[in-house]
């Protein structure tokens, strides 16, 4: 099997987990929801640790963004039903601890930022390599994690939607929020 894992992520090591499921799988801690609702539906529990598939990496989560989309999923506010049980979190930063079959360009131990479809409110998350990027040296996971949702939304709003060009003036409404803060900084460039 071509799955590669970091040496410190074996079942017997407490750096990743010290528990296994009844069928031998590794268990991790996660915040999960079993039904939609307010913040009272967030449950901290043991869940099976995911295994990366083709084109995916397993990331040890060191920072996770909390975005309005996570709240909307939790409340059931999207037009499509929230698939429960569900682990929110679509913005993470951490360290690659395993790579799936066929993955190239990501080594175990690489610091990364990623936008997985969900699952970021956990100790580990599987993410597609297409949505995962190395973190430059000197930047902490906490500093970089908000770039995925809020930063990219600000870039897309200014560059793609507004087609802002040098020398133009822009009004950013709600500039105190995450996306607005990024948009103001980007507009100055």
Question: What feature does the model see in each segment?
Answer:
Residues 69-75:
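Cytochrome P450 core scaffold surrounding the K-helix E-X-X-R motif
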Residues 48-66, 77-119:
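Glycine-rich beta-strand-centered segment in the early N-terminal region that forms part
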Residues 107, 147-189:
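Mid-domain Rossmann-like dinucleotide-binding core that forms the NAD(H)/NADP(H) cofactor-binding site
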Residues 116-129:
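A structural motif shared across PLP-dependent enzymes of the aminotransferase-like
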Residues 84, 139-147:
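Short pre-catalytic strand/loop immediately N-terminal to key active-site residues, enriched for Gly-Thr
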Residues 68, 139, 176-179:
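Residue-level detector of alpha-helix initiation sites
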